[in-house]
Amino acid sequence: VTYRFRDLLALEPLSAAELTFLLDQSKSFQEIQRHPLKKLATLRGKTVALAFFETSTRTRISFGTAASRLGADTMNLQAEASSLKKGETLLDTAFNLNAMKPDCLVMRHAASGAPDYVARHLDIPVVNAGDGTHEHPSQGLLDALTIRDRKGTIENLNVTILGDLSHSRVARSNIHLLGKFGCRFTLCGPAMWVPRELEKIAPGTPIRSVYKIEEALED
């Protein structure tokens, strides 16, 4: 299996085979965690730019740690201390980062579609670390890998997602990924947090909405 895309902007367009390829690659790197020396040479000589235009702790540190453990150097853009505060546009900021010749850009932004917009103007791979209410591909992959590790499979499972799903980019990535493996979804939360349009975001994937946790846990 080959990965068709230069970037990782969303899970929705990926096939089950491509998702399995990414999960298997991720699994192969888990062993690093158990090594006394947590370092590989996979990305030696490469530089990963981290541009988080929205507050992040776990995702930013996780990407930085992953890059370091795979041998890459990192450069960090602190949005609150950048020229964005002086009126520089997002695209100009991206061009300036690109001029420093990183090999990859990891980007989080509050606007849905911002990483895709930037990726169309740069000549390096862009990884979406969360954009608005659109998607959070890396978290979706991590969730699927965790489920596969614990359950032994991600196929044909009943999956319940609870909380404020109207704003959850993670829930959308979970649905797009796991739905390709025959999973069925129950979405649960107060009615204002579970918009019915979520039932239609992945055609062919069974999705139902309920508003009581007892109903959500029936299956």
Role assignments for model-derived ranges:
Residues V1-I61, T65:
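Positively charged, low-complexity intrinsically disordered leader regions
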Residues A16, T133-H136, E214-E218:
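A short acidic, often aromatic-flanked loop/helix-cap motif at beta-alpha or helix-coil junctions
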Residues E18-F21, Q25-S28, N96, Y117, ...:
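Alpha-helical scaffold segments in soluble metabolic enzymes
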Residues S28-R34, G87, P203-Y211:
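Short gly/ser/thr-rich secondary-structure transition/capping motifs
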Residues L37-R148:
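Phosphate/diphosphate ligand-binding glycine-rich loop within oxidoreductases
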Residues F53-T65, D149-D219:
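Glycine-rich phosphate/diphosphate-binding loop of Rossmann-like nucleotide-binding domains
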